[in-house]
Amino acid sequence: MKTKLREMLKFPCFFTYKIIGLAQPELVDQIIKVIQIQIPGDYTPQVKSSNRGNYLSVSITICAKNFEQIETLYHDISKINMVRMVL
């Protein structure tokens, strides 16, 4: 799968992450903080709450310069304690 994704993308390109995490006030700030380390910029994530309000879905788009940035951010975002899934 990694090879197909790598072949499909032409850099620089926009790439959207969808992150599912616990509905904590600091979740979005933590995600943006991790992204800012790799790719500084202004980010306006789209945030949706689950039906019961236990989880948040955060969609955030970055401009990646290479595939390694996409992979690194995927792993770094996954390490956030409140994050349950990164797509």
Curated annotation (Swiss-Prot):
GO terms for cellular component: cytosol. It comes from the Bacteria. It holds the Pfam family DUF493. Gene3D superfamilies: 3.30.70.260. Transmembrane segments: none annotated. HAMAP family: UPF0250. Belongs to the UPF0250 family. NCBIfam families: PRK04998.1. This is UPF0250 protein BUsg_472. It comes from Buchnera aphidicola subsp. Schizaphis graminum (strain Sg).
